């Protein structure tokens, strides 16, 4: 149903946000920013 679609989208967005935050953290830790 539509709720499954919404859940899927939210999961995807959450993964993307978490991934970009992790990348920023790695960048700062390695001093490459």
From Swiss-Prot:
An individual GO BP term: defense response to bacterium
InterPro entries for this protein: Antimicrobial_frog_2 (IPR012521)
Annotated disulfide bonds: 27-33
Keyword Iron-sulfur: no
A cellular component annotation (GO) from this entry: extracellular region
Principal subcellular localisation of the protein: secreted
Assigned keywords, A-Z: Amphibian defense peptide, Antibiotic, Antimicrobial, Disulfide bond, Secreted
Tissue: Expressed by the skin glands.
Keyword Disulfide bond: yes
Protein localization: Secreted
Family membership noted in the UniProt record: Belongs to the frog skin active peptide (FSAP) family. Brevinin subfamily.
Function: Antimicrobial peptide. A mixture of Brevinin-2DYc/2DYd is active against the Gram-positive bacterium S.aureus (MIC=15 uM) and the Gram-negative bacterium E.coli (MIC=15 uM).
Protein name as it appears in the record: Brevinin-2DYd
Organism: Rana dybowskii (Dybovsky's frog)
């Amino acid at each position: 149903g539509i709720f499954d679609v919404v859940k899927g989208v939210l999961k995807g967005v959450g993964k993307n946000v978490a991934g970009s935050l992790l990348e920023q953290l790695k960048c700062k830790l390695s001093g490459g920013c």
